[in-house]
């Protein structure tokens, strides 16, 4: 049975060292989390699986690691400086601040009906309601108060301010002088670093269309109301691909990447019934998108976006390129007066220059971790009436691949053998192997069930040739316990390597 609530997952993550509140000893920093010993392993395993699939296993992909600090002009011409904002509203009574669309989603149906009527918007179209409210903020604030919009913190109707936009980018300054010339930003997405490096990568690799550039990295958004644990946070990590194609082939490649990403998430252990493709209607599309399909996941807190696959057309390269007019670029935020490079592709057959279209699969690493934990969390009743919690993670993603456990910790022959075996298994390169000498084998099994360790290897008296029957026939054999079935088998240590490699290698 899965986790019944997000609180249950949060408690497990803290108790077992997956994820902690950042700066907790000083009251915590809202919307910021630290990954603990097991969390960092799970997160890295997910990222490595993504990189292996999309970079190493493909012949049409290159990698990139662009800087977090971003030149102001990059985000000026991308449109972020002017438009990367969320609608915000305050309750004068509680002094609480909320993102408007999130606040409205939590309202009772009768409250929303009154608000739709007050703003003269067709019922059921929340996107249109938010747009209407932002176009008439004074009227909207009064309508919210009159309609009895509830404050989630108090559960009572609020006295609401007119909504306004809040830019979510974190500003900083490069160098010792904090003036306009030194202004820079912490990147709000990893994508822009790929776009401005398009020509660099193209020149360095001599790639031909279609090809992609992949990147994993941190991004920062000053979210108005971070919530739902690591789902919506202010510092997060993205796994993004910008896949460059010829105009006219974009719709094919968009469909291709939607199917490819759905397939990959299932291979990582997410069930198909919990993955819901959602094609955004025209009124929900971002200003740069021709089409977007979101892969939604049934998180403990509800159905929410795990990954988005957008057809961004020529908007991005067209916004950052020089010679926009000569290249026939119309889908741009501003006339670019600063770019020094032509971000275009020369057709090797016709010699004609054009700006490629871009398909962007963009996934949240933190959301992926949360989805994997939610999917894997299982509570089972055992035949003896006891209950166990087990994380049924895909073995290759598990933070600890193998636990090597001496049956007793007061026999040097057994503990030293276990340590040597741990080193031998670690040399296989399959991931983290943990030596643990707690002295209570039953508790060790339960602990490793709870953190998702797929195999526990026990070194005992038989292993060192001191069987109870006085024989040495089981010398150099160990007990291997399976996490999911709890079944135990006896293997010679020389067989153990092949056994584990077969089950843990990608």
UniProtKB/Swiss-Prot annotation:
Binding site for ATP: 221-223, 231-236, 305-306, 364-367
Keyword Nucleotide-binding: yes
Gene field: glyQS
Subcellular location: Cytoplasm
Name of the protein this chain belongs to: Glycine--tRNA ligase
Residues annotated for substrate binding in this entry: 99, 189, 236-240, 360-364
GO cellular component, one term: cytoplasm
EC id: 6.1.1.14
GO biological process: one example: glycyl-tRNA aminoacylation
GO terms of molecular function: ATP binding; glycine-tRNA ligase activity; protein dimerization activity
Location, primary (coarse class): cytoplasm
SUPFAM superfamilies assigned to the protein according to its UniProt record, in alphabetical order: Class II aaRS ABD-related, Class II aaRS and biotin synthetases
Enzyme type, top EC level: ligase
Domain of life of the source: Bacteria
Family statement: Belongs to the class-II aminoacyl-tRNA synthetase family.
Pfam families assigned: HGTP_anticodon (PF03129), tRNA-synt_2b (PF00587)
Keywords from the UniProt entry: Aminoacyl-tRNA synthetase, ATP-binding, Cytoplasm, Ligase, Nucleotide-binding, Protein biosynthesis
Self-association and partners: Homodimer.
């Amino acid at each position: 049975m899965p986790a019944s609530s997000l609180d249950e997952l949060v408690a497990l993550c803290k108790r077992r060292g997956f994820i902690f509140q950042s700066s907790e000893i000083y009251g915590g920093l809202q919307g910021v989390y630290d990954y603990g010993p097991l969390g960092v392993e799970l997160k890295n395993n997910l990222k490595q699986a993504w990189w292996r699939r999309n970079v190493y296993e493909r012949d049409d992909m290159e990698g990139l690691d662009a800087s977090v600090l971003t030149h102001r002009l990059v985000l000026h011409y991308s449109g972020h400086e002017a438009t990367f904002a969320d609608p915000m509203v305050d309750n004068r009574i509680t002094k609480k601040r909320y993102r408007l669309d999130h606040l409205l989603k939590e309202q009772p149906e009768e409250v929303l009906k009154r608000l739709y009527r007050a703003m003269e918007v067709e019922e059921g179209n929340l996107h249109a309601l938010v747009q209407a409210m932002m176009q008439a903020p004074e009227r909207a604030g009064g309508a919210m108060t009159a309609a009895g919009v509830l404050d989630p913190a108090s559960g009572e109707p609020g006295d609401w301010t007119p909504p306004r936009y809040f830019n979510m980018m974190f500003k900083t300054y490069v160098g010792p002088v904090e003036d306009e010339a030194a202004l820079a930003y912490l990147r709000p997405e990893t994508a822009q670093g790929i776009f401005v490096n398009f020509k660099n990568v193209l020149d360095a690799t001599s790639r031909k269309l279609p090809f992609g550039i992949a990147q994993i990295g941190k991004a920062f958004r000053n979210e108005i109301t971070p919530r739902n644990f690591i789902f919506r946070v202010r510092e997060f990590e993205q796994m993004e691909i910008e896949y460059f194609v010829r105009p006219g082939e974009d719709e094919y490649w968009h469909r291709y990447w939607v199917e490819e990403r759905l397939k990959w998430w299932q291979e990582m252990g997410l069930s198909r019934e919990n993955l819901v493709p959602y094609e955004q209607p025209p009124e929900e599309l971002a200003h740069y998108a021709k089409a977007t399909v979101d892969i939604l996941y049934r998180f403990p807190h509800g159905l929410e976006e795990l990954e988005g696959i957008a057809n961004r057309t020529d908007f991005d390269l067209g916004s950052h390129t020089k010679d926009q007019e000569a290249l026939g670029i119309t889908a741009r935020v501003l006339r670019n007066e600063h770019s020094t490079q032509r971000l275009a592709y020369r057709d090797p057959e016709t010699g004609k220059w054009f700006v490629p279209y871009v398909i962007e699969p963009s996934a949240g690493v933190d959301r992926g971790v949360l989805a994997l934990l939610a999917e894997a969390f299982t509570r089972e009743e055992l035949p003896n009436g006891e209950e166990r919690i087990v994380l049924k993670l895909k073995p290759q993603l598990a933070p600890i691949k193998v636990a090597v456990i001496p049956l007793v910790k007061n026999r040097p022959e057994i503990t030293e053998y276990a340590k040597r075996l741990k080193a031998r298994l670690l040399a296989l390169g399959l991931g983290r192997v943990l030596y643990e000498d707690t002295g209570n084998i039953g508790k060790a099994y339960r602990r490793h069930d709870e953190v998702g360790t797929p195999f526990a290897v026990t070194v005992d008296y038989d292993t060192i040739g001191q069987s109870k029957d006085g024989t040495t026939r089981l010398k150099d054999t160990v007990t291997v316990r399976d996490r999911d079935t709890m079944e135990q088998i006896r293997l010679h240590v020389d067989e153990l390597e092949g056994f584990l490699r077969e089950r843990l290698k990608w």
